[in-house]
C-alpha cells in the first residue's frame, strides 16, 4: 500500500470506538504527507496517521511514514503497537498518544524534529504514560527520545537514542535488557483489545 496526501493525513479516523491497522506478513506499506494540513473539520489534523480514537497497529509487515510537516502517527486516545517494522521520519513527534503509548514489540527507526515518542495528557495526570514491554528502538530526536507527562515503564528491549535536548541534553545511549520503570502505567499481558483498556 502506498498513500500520499499532499494536504492532509494519509489516514484519518474521525470517529470510532477502536481502530486496528494490520500490517500483513511481508507487506511493505508507505504513507506520507506533502507538507501541509488544510482544515477539513474542527479537528486539528497534524499527522500522517491521525486518529481521534484508540488506535492499534499490529501484524508483522513494515510501515514507512514520511511527515514533511507535523507528526508521524497520532492517537488522541491510546496508541498501541503490538508488532511490525516501522521507519518514521517526522518534522515533529514520531509517535504521539494523548492518553498513552503502549508497545508490546516491534522494530522502530524514528527520526523526529521533536520527541521520537511523546505522550501527554494535560487534563488527567494518571494518563499520558508510556509502557514498553519490548522491541528494538533506534531513535534520533531533536527533543527527547521518549517523553511522558505521566509514568514511563520500560520492561525490556534494545534502545539506541541520539537526542538534541528536551528534558535534558543527551549523547548517544544504548541499553539492552530491562529498562527503567517509572510506575505501573498499563498492562501488556494480552495484545489488542486488552492493551487498550488496562491501566484505565
Give names to the regions the model predicted.
Residues 1-200:
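A composition-driven surface/loop motif
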